[in-house]
């Protein structure tokens, strides 16, 4: 079985995340693509919203997307302590494709147990138009081109905090979850 991992804090999920999942799934002909919500990522600041809320929004967005084989995955938020990609990969029985953008690919050398990860996954290198190329010696890479979308979770949080609309930036089903919890000030 060919399994993709699209991981992130998804704080909150936005349309760019959904585009990545859909394009990686289709371009690589994957049997399953797991949108994995990070629990306590060791290289990032703690998320604003708790894992359960972020997962609920991801689950709503993915269900609304309605593409067979793309699923929301809460395995990392259920795991205590720092979450590492290698631990998630080791739980998968099949050929694993790890979706990663150029920015994160440049920092792979700092990842936990990176040598093991290199042996276990094919990188689904998500390339945005105009993004600089990245050299990944020793990695097996399958490039996936996606359309340029100028959206980020931090931008969405800032707009919500300022009371500005995020229509078109956050999947409507996910936005309903965000409204329910009211985690981001000024949510509308």
PLM ranges: what are they?
Residues 1-188:
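Nucleotidyltransferase catalytic core that binds NTPs
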């Amino acid at each position: 079985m060919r399994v993709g991992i699209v991981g992130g804090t998804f704080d909150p999920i936005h349309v760019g995340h959904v585009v990545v999942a859909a394009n990686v799934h289709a371009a690589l002909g994957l049997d399953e693509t797991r949108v994995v919500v990070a629990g306590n990522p060791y290289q990032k600041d703690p998320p604003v919203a708790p894992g359960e809320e972020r997962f609920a929004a991801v689950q709503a967005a993915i269900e609304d997307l309605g593409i067979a084989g793309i699923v929301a995955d809460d395995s990392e938020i259920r795991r205590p302590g720092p979450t590492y990609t290698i631990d998630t990969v080791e739980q998968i029985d099949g050929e694993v494709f790890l979706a990663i953008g150029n920015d994160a690919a440049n920092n792979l050398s700092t990842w936990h147990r990176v040598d093991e990860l290199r042996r276990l996954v094919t990188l689904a290198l998500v390339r945005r138009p105009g993004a600089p190329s990245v050299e990944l010696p020793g990695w097996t890479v399958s490039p996936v081109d996606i359309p340029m979308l100028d959206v980020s979770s931090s931008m969405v949080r800032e707009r919500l905090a300022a009371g500005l609309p995020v229509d078109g930036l956050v999947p409507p089903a996910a936005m309903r979850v965000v409204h329910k919890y009211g985690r981001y000030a000024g949510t509308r």
